[in-house]
């Protein structure tokens, strides 16, 4: 009886985040599972985009209707966060970031990657790897620096001493905390969702984990929206005129 009671807790103790599948490139080790699943995610996005727009109709239906809805949603998000003057040139970037994170998160929540056997390690959602989320956050940082310098030139750096020069250290620190908060928020939420589902599946394999998985799909979509919204807000802040 005691073994029966203790067994679920021993299974919980064995729940892990997952082992990385490494590729050796010279002296460097690359997380192969991130690249493999990222290619799958990009193939899904490109495939749906191609099929949805290969035979355009004046009255959209089916997949074309869905792709137009997504495009309008991202366009409105960019317009709200960046402003009417600058938003159009940033719709492709925000759309790419949003769709990549969204499909990556859902691939981890819905697809049984652990069932695919590899020589070592296992497949998982790209956003389950801190390297992916940091890379996305750094791309966003580069984007808003580029947006600000492209519009204002070197005057962009005046923001570090506005409205007062003593705020320089705080404004510089803010440029480091933005990518950190973006990357760790996304990584932490996806990691926590996978751990919770893993614990529940080890305790009660049927029925009970399903609502948690559905909740995970919802929070995964929210995380993609939050990341894209904040990316747009940072770009909008960089290009806005300060008087």
From Swiss-Prot:
The protein's GO terms of the molecular function aspect are: proton-transporting ATP synthase activity, rotational mechanism
Main localization (coarse): plastid
Q: Which GO terms describe its cellular component?
A: chloroplast thylakoid membrane; plasma membrane; proton-transporting ATP synthase complex
Q: Which UniProt keywords apply?
A: ATP synthesis, CF(0), Chloroplast, Hydrogen ion transport, Ion transport, Membrane, Plastid, Thylakoid, Transmembrane, Transmembrane helix, Transport
Segments traversing the membrane: 32-52, 96-116, 129-149, 195-215, 216-236
- Where does the protein end up? Plastid, Chloroplast thylakoid membrane
**Keyword Chloroplast in record:** yes
Quaternary structure, per UniProt, is:
F-type ATPases have 2 components, CF(1) - the catalytic core - and CF(0) - the membrane proton channel. CF(1) has five subunits: alpha(3), beta(3), gamma(1), delta(1), epsilon(1). CF(0) has four main subunits: a, b, b' and c.
**Alphabetical list of HAMAP family matching this protein:** ATP_synth_a_bact
Name listed for the protein in its UniProt record: ATP synthase subunit a, chloroplastic
> What's the encoding gene here?
atpI
């Amino acid at each position: 009886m005691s073994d029966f009671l203790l067994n679920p807790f021993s299974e919980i103790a064995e729940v892990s985040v997952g082992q990385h599948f490494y590729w050796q490139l010279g002296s460097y080790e690359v997380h192969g599972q991130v690249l493999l699943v990222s290619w799958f995610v990009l193939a899904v996005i490109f495939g749906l985009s191609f099929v949805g727009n290969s035979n355009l109709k004046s009255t959209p239906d089916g997949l074309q209707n869905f792709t137009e809805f997504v495009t309008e949603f991202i366009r409105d998000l960019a317009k709200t966060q960046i402003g009417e003057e600058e938003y159009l040139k940033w719709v492709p970037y925000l759309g790419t970031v949003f769709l990549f994170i969204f499909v990556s998160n859902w691939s981890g929540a819905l697809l049984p990657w652990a069932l695919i056997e590899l020589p070592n390690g296992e497949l998982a959602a790209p956003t389950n790897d801190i390297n992916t989320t940091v890379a996305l956050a750094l791309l966003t940082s580069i984007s808003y620096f580029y947006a600000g310098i492209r519009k204002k030139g070197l005057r962009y750096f005046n923001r570090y001493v506005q409205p007062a020069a003593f705020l320089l250290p705080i404004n510089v620190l803010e440029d480091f905390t933005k990518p950190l908060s973006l990357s760790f928020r996304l990584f932490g939420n996806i990691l926590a969702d996978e751990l919770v589902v893993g614990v529940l599946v080890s305790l009660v394999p049927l029925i009970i984990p399903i609502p948690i998985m559905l909740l995970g799909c919802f929070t995964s979509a929210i995380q993609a929206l939050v990341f894209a919204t904040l990316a747009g807000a940072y770009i909008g802040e960089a290009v806005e005129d300060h008087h």
